[in-house]
Protein backbone atom coordinates (compact mmCIF):
# COMPACT_ATOMS: atom_id res chain seq x y z
CA UNK A 1 0.00 0.00 0.00
CA UNK A 2 1.36 3.40 -1.00
CA UNK A 3 0.54 6.29 1.31
CA UNK A 4 1.36 9.83 0.25
CA UNK A 5 2.01 11.59 3.56
CA UNK A 6 2.87 14.90 1.92
CA UNK A 7 -0.38 14.87 -0.06
CA UNK A 8 -2.41 13.88 2.99
CA UNK A 9 -0.96 16.71 5.09
CA UNK A 10 -1.51 19.26 2.34
CA UNK A 11 -5.08 18.07 1.73
CA UNK A 12 -5.79 18.25 5.46
CA UNK A 13 -4.76 21.90 5.75
CA UNK A 14 -5.85 23.19 2.34
CA UNK A 15 -7.96 26.29 2.78
CA UNK A 16 -6.97 26.83 6.42
CA UNK A 17 -6.77 30.39 7.69
CA UNK A 18 -3.60 31.82 9.25
CA UNK A 19 -5.10 31.28 12.70
CA UNK A 20 -5.87 27.65 11.92
CA UNK A 21 -2.37 27.09 10.54
CA UNK A 22 -0.83 28.66 13.64
CA UNK A 23 -2.98 26.48 15.87
CA UNK A 24 -1.88 23.39 13.94
CA UNK A 25 1.79 24.31 14.31
CA UNK A 26 1.55 25.23 17.99
CA UNK A 27 -0.43 22.10 18.82
CA UNK A 28 2.08 19.90 17.00
CA UNK A 29 5.03 21.46 18.82
CA UNK A 30 3.39 21.52 22.25
CA UNK A 31 2.28 17.91 22.01
CA UNK A 32 5.89 16.83 21.60
CA UNK A 33 4.74 13.72 19.76
CA UNK A 34 7.20 12.26 17.26
CA UNK A 35 4.36 11.42 14.88
CA UNK A 36 3.79 15.15 14.32
CA UNK A 37 7.29 15.76 12.92
CA UNK A 38 6.58 14.68 9.33
CA UNK A 39 3.64 17.08 9.15
CA UNK A 40 5.76 19.94 10.42
CA UNK A 41 8.33 19.01 7.81
CA UNK A 42 5.72 19.29 5.07
CA UNK A 43 4.70 22.72 6.37
CA UNK A 44 8.34 23.82 6.43
CA UNK A 45 8.75 22.57 2.86
CA UNK A 46 5.87 24.83 1.76
CA UNK A 47 7.41 27.79 3.57
CA UNK A 48 10.85 27.12 2.09
CA UNK A 49 9.58 26.71 -1.47
CA UNK A 50 7.65 29.99 -1.25
CA UNK A 51 10.41 32.04 0.39
CA UNK A 52 12.81 34.28 -1.46
CA UNK A 53 16.57 34.13 -0.86
CA UNK A 54 16.48 36.78 1.90
CA UNK A 55 13.72 34.95 3.75
CA UNK A 56 15.61 31.67 3.42
CA UNK A 57 18.75 33.30 4.79
CA UNK A 58 16.77 34.65 7.75
CA UNK A 59 15.28 31.22 8.43
CA UNK A 60 18.72 29.61 8.33
CA UNK A 61 20.12 32.23 10.74
CA UNK A 62 17.20 31.63 13.10
CA UNK A 63 17.68 27.88 12.86
CA UNK A 64 21.42 28.15 13.46
CA UNK A 65 20.91 30.35 16.53
CA UNK A 66 18.17 28.11 17.87
CA UNK A 67 20.41 25.06 17.58
CA UNK A 68 23.27 26.86 19.33
CA UNK A 69 20.96 27.66 22.25
CA UNK A 70 19.94 24.01 22.78
From Swiss-Prot:
Keywords, ordered alphabetically: Sporulation
Major subcellular location class: other
UniProt KW Repressor keyword: no
rRNA processing found in the keyword field: no
Annotated localization: Spore core
SS bonds (residue pairs): none
NCBIfam families tied to this protein: SASP_sspI
Entry protein name: Small, acid-soluble spore protein I
Amino acid sequence: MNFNLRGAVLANIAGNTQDQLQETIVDAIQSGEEKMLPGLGVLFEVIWKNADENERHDMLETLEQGLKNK
